[in-house]
Swiss-Prot record:
The keyword Nucleus does not apply. Belongs to the initiator RepB protein family. One of its GO terms (molecular function) is DNA-directed DNA polymerase activity. GO terms for biological process: DNA replication initiation. It comes from the Bacteria. The lineage of its organism: Bacteria, Pseudomonadati, Pseudomonadota, Betaproteobacteria, Neisseriales. This is Replication protein. It comes from Neisseria gonorrhoeae. InterPro entries: Initiator_Rep_WH1, WH-like_DNA-bd_sf, WH_DNA-bd_sf. Keywords: DNA replication, Plasmid.
Length: 328
Protein backbone atom coordinates (compact mmCIF):
# COMPACT_ATOMS: atom_id res chain seq x y z
CA UNK A 1 0.00 0.00 0.00
CA UNK A 2 1.48 3.39 -1.02
CA UNK A 3 2.46 6.05 1.49
CA UNK A 4 0.84 9.50 1.65
CA UNK A 5 -2.59 8.25 0.62
CA UNK A 6 -4.86 10.90 -0.87
CA UNK A 7 -8.61 10.89 -0.24
CA UNK A 8 -10.64 12.23 -3.18
CA UNK A 9 -14.40 12.78 -2.94
CA UNK A 10 -17.04 14.59 -4.96
CA UNK A 11 -18.19 17.71 -3.12
CA UNK A 12 -21.76 16.40 -3.19
CA UNK A 13 -20.61 13.35 -1.21
CA UNK A 14 -18.83 15.53 1.36
CA UNK A 15 -22.08 17.46 1.81
CA UNK A 16 -24.27 14.34 1.87
CA UNK A 17 -26.14 13.08 4.91
CA UNK A 18 -24.82 9.92 6.52
CA UNK A 19 -24.08 8.49 9.94
CA UNK A 20 -20.81 6.64 10.51
CA UNK A 21 -18.66 5.83 13.53
CA UNK A 22 -15.04 6.95 13.74
CA UNK A 23 -13.74 3.49 12.76
CA UNK A 24 -16.18 3.25 9.85
CA UNK A 25 -14.97 6.62 8.55
CA UNK A 26 -11.37 5.49 8.96
CA UNK A 27 -12.00 2.31 6.95
CA UNK A 28 -13.70 4.23 4.14
CA UNK A 29 -10.93 6.85 4.13
CA UNK A 30 -8.30 4.10 3.91
CA UNK A 31 -10.21 2.42 1.08
CA UNK A 32 -10.78 5.65 -0.84
CA UNK A 33 -7.16 6.62 -0.29
CA UNK A 34 -5.97 3.47 -2.06
CA UNK A 35 -8.25 4.05 -5.05
CA UNK A 36 -7.01 5.21 -8.40
CA UNK A 37 -9.38 8.14 -9.12
CA UNK A 38 -9.16 7.34 -12.83
CA UNK A 39 -10.10 3.67 -12.40
CA UNK A 40 -13.44 1.94 -11.86
CA UNK A 41 -12.03 -0.71 -9.53
CA UNK A 42 -14.56 -1.45 -6.80
CA UNK A 43 -12.92 -4.20 -4.72
CA UNK A 44 -10.27 -3.32 -2.15
CA UNK A 45 -8.18 -5.35 0.27
CA UNK A 46 -6.37 -4.08 3.34
CA UNK A 47 -4.73 -5.65 6.36
CA UNK A 48 -4.72 -4.91 10.06
CA UNK A 49 -1.15 -3.71 9.60
CA UNK A 50 -2.30 -1.23 6.93
CA UNK A 51 -4.98 0.12 9.25
CA UNK A 52 -2.67 0.51 12.23
CA UNK A 53 0.04 2.13 10.10
CA UNK A 54 -2.32 4.78 8.72
CA UNK A 55 -4.04 5.39 12.08
CA UNK A 56 -1.20 5.17 14.63
CA UNK A 57 -3.38 5.69 17.70
CA UNK A 58 -5.15 2.37 17.08
CA UNK A 59 -3.89 -0.41 19.35
CA UNK A 60 -2.50 -3.40 17.46
CA UNK A 61 -4.06 -5.70 20.06
CA UNK A 62 -7.60 -4.42 19.49
CA UNK A 63 -7.38 -3.49 15.80
CA UNK A 64 -8.76 -6.73 14.34
CA UNK A 65 -11.91 -6.67 16.47
CA UNK A 66 -12.41 -2.95 15.81
CA UNK A 67 -12.13 -3.40 12.05
CA UNK A 68 -14.36 -6.47 12.01
CA UNK A 69 -17.09 -4.70 13.97
CA UNK A 70 -16.84 -1.55 11.85
CA UNK A 71 -16.99 -3.43 8.54
CA UNK A 72 -20.05 -5.30 9.75
CA UNK A 73 -21.79 -1.98 10.47
CA UNK A 74 -20.68 -0.32 7.23
CA UNK A 75 -22.50 -3.04 5.30
CA UNK A 76 -25.79 -1.69 6.65
CA UNK A 77 -24.96 2.01 6.32
CA UNK A 78 -26.36 4.29 3.64
CA UNK A 79 -25.69 7.78 2.36
CA UNK A 80 -28.26 10.30 1.14
CA UNK A 81 -27.55 13.00 -1.45
CA UNK A 82 -29.92 15.76 -2.44
CA UNK A 83 -30.13 18.36 -5.19
CA UNK A 84 -32.89 20.62 -6.51
CA UNK A 85 -34.66 17.81 -8.33
CA UNK A 86 -34.23 14.66 -6.28
CA UNK A 87 -33.12 12.85 -3.16
CA UNK A 88 -31.05 9.69 -3.64
CA UNK A 89 -30.12 7.12 -1.02
CA UNK A 90 -27.66 4.27 -1.54
CA UNK A 91 -25.31 2.01 0.38
CA UNK A 92 -21.56 2.42 0.69
CA UNK A 93 -20.54 -1.21 0.20
CA UNK A 94 -22.08 -4.21 -1.54
CA UNK A 95 -20.08 -6.98 0.12
CA UNK A 96 -17.59 -7.63 2.88
CA UNK A 97 -15.12 -10.47 3.36
CA UNK A 98 -12.96 -11.58 6.28
CA UNK A 99 -9.92 -13.73 5.51
CA UNK A 100 -9.59 -15.79 8.67
CA UNK A 101 -6.13 -16.06 10.21
CA UNK A 102 -4.69 -13.66 7.59
CA UNK A 103 -5.55 -10.36 9.23
CA UNK A 104 -6.95 -9.25 5.86
CA UNK A 105 -10.27 -7.71 4.87
CA UNK A 106 -11.99 -7.01 1.57
CA UNK A 107 -14.84 -4.66 0.80
CA UNK A 108 -16.60 -3.98 -2.48
CA UNK A 109 -18.00 -0.51 -3.06
CA UNK A 110 -21.47 -0.19 -4.60
CA UNK A 111 -22.02 0.90 -8.19
CA UNK A 112 -23.99 3.87 -6.88
CA UNK A 113 -21.17 5.32 -4.76
CA UNK A 114 -18.40 4.92 -7.34
CA UNK A 115 -19.30 8.02 -9.44
CA UNK A 116 -18.66 10.10 -6.31
CA UNK A 117 -15.15 8.66 -5.91
CA UNK A 118 -13.69 8.07 -9.38
CA UNK A 119 -13.66 9.61 -12.86
CA UNK A 120 -14.21 13.01 -11.24
CA UNK A 121 -13.80 15.92 -13.65
CA UNK A 122 -14.69 18.79 -11.36
CA UNK A 123 -16.36 19.76 -8.09
CA UNK A 124 -14.26 17.47 -5.93
CA UNK A 125 -12.07 17.83 -2.85
CA UNK A 126 -8.89 15.99 -1.97
CA UNK A 127 -6.64 15.82 1.07
CA UNK A 128 -3.90 13.60 2.44
CA UNK A 129 -5.10 10.86 4.75
CA UNK A 130 -2.34 11.65 7.24
CA UNK A 131 -4.02 14.97 8.06
CA UNK A 132 -6.98 13.18 9.70
CA UNK A 133 -5.05 10.13 10.94
CA UNK A 134 -4.90 11.29 14.58
CA UNK A 135 -8.49 12.53 14.84
CA UNK A 136 -10.63 10.78 17.44
CA UNK A 137 -13.92 12.48 16.60
CA UNK A 138 -16.31 11.97 13.70
CA UNK A 139 -17.20 15.65 13.96
CA UNK A 140 -13.57 16.67 13.50
CA UNK A 141 -13.30 14.71 10.25
CA UNK A 142 -16.58 15.99 8.85
CA UNK A 143 -15.78 19.61 9.65
CA UNK A 144 -12.25 19.16 8.27
CA UNK A 145 -13.68 17.92 4.95
CA UNK A 146 -16.29 20.69 4.80
CA UNK A 147 -13.71 23.44 5.29
CA UNK A 148 -11.09 21.78 3.08
CA UNK A 149 -13.59 22.27 0.24
CA UNK A 150 -13.10 26.02 0.68
CA UNK A 151 -9.42 26.01 1.57
CA UNK A 152 -8.42 28.02 -1.51
CA UNK A 153 -11.14 30.60 -0.75
CA UNK A 154 -9.97 31.04 2.84
CA UNK A 155 -13.34 30.91 4.58
CA UNK A 156 -16.69 29.17 4.56
CA UNK A 157 -19.98 30.28 6.09
CA UNK A 158 -22.41 27.54 7.18
CA UNK A 159 -25.73 27.99 8.94
CA UNK A 160 -25.98 26.35 12.34
CA UNK A 161 -29.01 24.39 11.13
CA UNK A 162 -27.16 22.98 8.11
CA UNK A 163 -24.05 22.15 10.11
CA UNK A 164 -26.11 20.22 12.67
CA UNK A 165 -27.70 18.29 9.81
CA UNK A 166 -24.31 17.40 8.30
CA UNK A 167 -22.97 16.39 11.71
CA UNK A 168 -26.09 14.29 12.37
CA UNK A 169 -26.94 16.15 15.58
CA UNK A 170 -30.03 17.99 14.32
CA UNK A 171 -32.12 16.56 17.17
CA UNK A 172 -29.54 17.35 19.84
CA UNK A 173 -28.18 20.50 21.46
CA UNK A 174 -31.14 22.90 21.12
CA UNK A 175 -28.99 25.60 22.73
CA UNK A 176 -26.00 26.84 20.73
CA UNK A 177 -23.81 26.97 23.84
CA UNK A 178 -24.18 23.21 24.27
CA UNK A 179 -23.40 22.57 20.61
CA UNK A 180 -20.38 24.84 20.85
CA UNK A 181 -18.98 23.25 24.01
CA UNK A 182 -19.65 19.60 23.16
CA UNK A 183 -19.13 19.53 19.39
CA UNK A 184 -17.57 22.62 17.80
CA UNK A 185 -14.85 23.59 20.25
CA UNK A 186 -13.45 20.03 20.64
CA UNK A 187 -13.50 19.53 16.85
CA UNK A 188 -11.78 22.84 16.08
CA UNK A 189 -9.18 22.18 18.77
CA UNK A 190 -8.44 18.77 17.27
CA UNK A 191 -8.19 20.20 13.74
CA UNK A 192 -5.83 22.95 14.90
CA UNK A 193 -3.64 20.59 16.92
CA UNK A 194 -3.53 17.53 14.66
CA UNK A 195 -4.04 18.60 11.02
CA UNK A 196 -2.42 20.87 8.45
CA UNK A 197 -5.04 23.60 8.91
CA UNK A 198 -5.52 26.47 11.32
CA UNK A 199 -9.19 27.36 11.78
CA UNK A 200 -11.00 30.16 13.59
CA UNK A 201 -14.77 30.32 13.95
CA UNK A 202 -16.72 33.58 13.80
CA UNK A 203 -20.29 33.55 15.14
CA UNK A 204 -22.79 35.44 12.99
CA UNK A 205 -25.97 36.58 14.69
CA UNK A 206 -29.44 37.25 13.36
CA UNK A 207 -31.04 39.27 16.10
CA UNK A 208 -29.99 37.59 19.34
CA UNK A 209 -29.59 34.14 17.81
CA UNK A 210 -26.39 32.61 16.42
CA UNK A 211 -27.58 31.99 12.88
CA UNK A 212 -24.41 30.87 11.10
CA UNK A 213 -20.70 30.27 11.54
CA UNK A 214 -17.87 31.58 9.41
CA UNK A 215 -14.89 29.23 9.37
CA UNK A 216 -11.71 31.20 8.60
CA UNK A 217 -9.24 28.72 7.11
CA UNK A 218 -5.47 28.98 7.04
CA UNK A 219 -2.54 26.70 6.35
CA UNK A 220 -0.16 25.97 9.23
CA UNK A 221 2.79 26.17 6.87
CA UNK A 222 1.81 29.58 5.53
CA UNK A 223 0.83 30.88 8.95
CA UNK A 224 4.11 29.75 10.50
CA UNK A 225 6.04 31.30 7.62
CA UNK A 226 4.19 34.59 7.98
CA UNK A 227 4.69 34.72 11.75
CA UNK A 228 8.37 33.90 11.37
CA UNK A 229 8.94 36.61 8.77
CA UNK A 230 7.03 39.27 10.67
CA UNK A 231 8.94 38.44 13.84
CA UNK A 232 12.30 38.59 12.11
CA UNK A 233 11.82 41.87 10.25
CA UNK A 234 13.09 44.80 12.33
CA UNK A 235 10.40 47.30 13.20
CA UNK A 236 10.25 50.56 11.31
CA UNK A 237 11.60 53.66 13.11
CA UNK A 238 9.06 55.78 14.94
CA UNK A 239 7.74 58.64 12.83
CA UNK A 240 8.26 61.12 15.67
CA UNK A 241 12.00 60.96 15.03
CA UNK A 242 11.40 62.66 11.67
CA UNK A 243 9.18 65.49 12.86
CA UNK A 244 5.71 66.21 14.12
CA UNK A 245 3.96 66.03 10.75
CA UNK A 246 5.06 62.84 8.98
CA UNK A 247 2.09 62.31 6.71
CA UNK A 248 1.34 60.07 3.72
CA UNK A 249 -0.86 61.44 0.95
CA UNK A 250 -2.87 58.27 0.26
CA UNK A 251 -4.37 59.52 -2.99
CA UNK A 252 -0.99 60.55 -4.40
CA UNK A 253 2.05 59.32 -2.43
CA UNK A 254 4.32 61.67 -4.40
CA UNK A 255 2.59 64.58 -2.70
CA UNK A 256 3.50 63.32 0.79
CA UNK A 257 5.54 65.78 2.83
CA UNK A 258 9.34 65.81 3.04
CA UNK A 259 9.45 64.26 6.50
CA UNK A 260 7.40 61.30 5.29
CA UNK A 261 9.81 60.86 2.38
CA UNK A 262 12.78 60.60 4.77
CA UNK A 263 10.95 58.09 6.94
CA UNK A 264 9.88 56.03 3.90
CA UNK A 265 13.47 55.94 2.60
CA UNK A 266 14.76 54.47 5.86
CA UNK A 267 11.87 51.99 6.06
CA UNK A 268 12.58 50.87 2.49
CA UNK A 269 16.18 50.15 3.46
CA UNK A 270 14.95 47.92 6.30
CA UNK A 271 12.75 45.99 3.86
CA UNK A 272 15.60 45.64 1.38
CA UNK A 273 17.93 44.30 4.06
CA UNK A 274 15.35 41.79 5.23
CA UNK A 275 13.73 40.30 2.12
CA UNK A 276 15.43 38.43 -0.72
CA UNK A 277 12.37 36.94 -2.47
CA UNK A 278 9.20 38.81 -3.40
CA UNK A 279 7.08 35.69 -2.83
CA UNK A 280 8.15 35.67 0.83
CA UNK A 281 7.12 39.28 1.46
CA UNK A 282 4.05 39.61 3.69
CA UNK A 283 0.94 41.28 2.27
CA UNK A 284 1.40 44.33 4.48
CA UNK A 285 5.01 44.74 3.40
CA UNK A 286 4.06 44.35 -0.28
CA UNK A 287 1.82 47.32 0.35
CA UNK A 288 4.66 49.15 2.13
CA UNK A 289 7.04 48.48 -0.75
CA UNK A 290 4.59 49.91 -3.27
CA UNK A 291 3.87 53.02 -1.18
CA UNK A 292 7.55 53.74 -0.55
CA UNK A 293 8.44 53.31 -4.22
CA UNK A 294 5.46 55.37 -5.37
CA UNK A 295 6.42 58.24 -3.08
CA UNK A 296 9.75 58.93 -4.79
CA UNK A 297 10.84 57.91 -8.30
CA UNK A 298 14.45 57.72 -7.10
CA UNK A 299 13.62 54.90 -4.68
CA UNK A 300 14.52 51.44 -5.98
CA UNK A 301 14.09 47.84 -4.86
CA UNK A 302 16.16 44.80 -5.75
CA UNK A 303 12.95 42.74 -5.74
CA UNK A 304 11.25 44.63 -8.55
CA UNK A 305 9.20 47.62 -9.59
CA UNK A 306 5.92 48.98 -8.27
CA UNK A 307 4.00 46.86 -10.77
CA UNK A 308 5.80 43.72 -9.58
CA UNK A 309 4.53 44.27 -6.05
CA UNK A 310 1.00 44.97 -7.30
CA UNK A 311 1.08 41.78 -9.38
CA UNK A 312 2.19 39.74 -6.37
CA UNK A 313 -0.68 41.16 -4.34
CA UNK A 314 -3.09 40.33 -7.16
CA UNK A 315 -1.92 36.71 -7.16
CA UNK A 316 -2.85 36.57 -3.48
CA UNK A 317 -6.27 38.11 -4.08
CA UNK A 318 -5.57 41.71 -3.05
CA UNK A 319 -5.35 45.15 -4.61
CA UNK A 320 -4.52 48.63 -3.32
CA UNK A 321 -7.13 51.35 -3.01
CA UNK A 322 -5.81 54.67 -1.68
CA UNK A 323 -2.73 52.84 -0.40
CA UNK A 324 -4.78 50.33 1.61
CA UNK A 325 -5.08 46.56 1.11
CA UNK A 326 -8.46 45.50 -0.26
CA UNK A 327 -9.62 41.93 -0.92
CA UNK A 328 -10.45 41.41 -4.60
Amino acid sequence: MPNDLVVVKANSLIEANYRLSIDEIRILALTIGTMDPKSNQKIFDFTVADFVREFPEISQDNAYKQIQAAIKRIYDRSVKTEDKDRVTEFRWVSSRTYFKKEGRFRIAMTDEVMPYLTQLKGQFTQYQLKHIAYFNSVHSIRIYELITQYRSVGSREITVEKLKEWLQVENKYPRFNSLNQRVLEPAITEINEKSDLVVEVEQIKRGRTIHSLNFVIGSKKRTAQKIEEVAKRPVFPHKNKYGKFVKLDKQNPKMSNHEYGLWARDCLKILEDHYTDITKVTNEDLRNYWVFLAGNDSNRSKLGSKSDFLNELKKRGYKLVDCELVKI
